[in-house]
């Protein structure tokens, strides 16, 4: 507080838009998914949630938004650690999984791992296309002035644009 940094950040977001629905998409979804992909291990909850609280979001609203966005990016968080380390290490020596991969026509484990990653990305991208809209609807229903899902849905164009800005590159890279 004494340095005034939070006031500067708050003013910066207000200059972008005073609309909390857009702010939650920018902070929780776009920033949150970015830092999950780069740092992983729940970093969005540790960084984006306090940022939203500092900007004046109710604490519970910030926590709910931070947790909802954790649905899509987690499988490739920390530069793919859950897939590259978790799935690979956890399944590569399992005789049943090796037999299953062979049954599906994969002669190399790495090809099967890529297949798993692609399937996960497709499922998460399909669901992720609607996560920003869900976040805004939940925010306005439980924390908005009118307690209305409809208020959250009014920003659907930006919500879908933001979702696709994350999910399309997500699919391409996966």
Language model features with spans:
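Membrane-core helix-loop-helix motifs of multi-pass transport proteins
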Residues: 55, 61-174
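Membrane-embedded alpha-helical segments and adjacent helix-loop junctions characteristic
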Residues: 1-55
């Amino acid at each position: 507080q004494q340095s005034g940094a939070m006031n500067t950040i708050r003013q910066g977001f207000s200059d972008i838009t005073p609309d909390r629905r857009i702010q939650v998409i920018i902070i929780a979804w776009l920033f949150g998914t970015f830092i999950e992909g780069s740092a992983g291990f729940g970093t969005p909850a540790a960084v984006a949630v306090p940022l939203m609280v500092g900007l004046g979001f109710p604490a519970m609203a910030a926590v709910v938004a931070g947790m909802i966005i954790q649905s899509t990016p987690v499988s490739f968080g920390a530069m793919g650690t859950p897939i590259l380390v978790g799935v690979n290490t956890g399944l590569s020596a399992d005789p049943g999984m090796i037999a299953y991969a062979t049954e599906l026509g994969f002669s190399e484990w790495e090809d099967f791992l890529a297949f798993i990653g692609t399937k996960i990305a497709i499922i998460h991208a399909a669901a992720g296309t609607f996560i920003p809209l869900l976040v805004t609807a939940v925010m306005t229903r439980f924390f908005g002035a009118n307690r209305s899902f409809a208020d959250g849905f009014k920003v659907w164009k930006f919500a879908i644009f933001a979702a696709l800005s994350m999910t399309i590159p997500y699919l391409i890279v996966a």
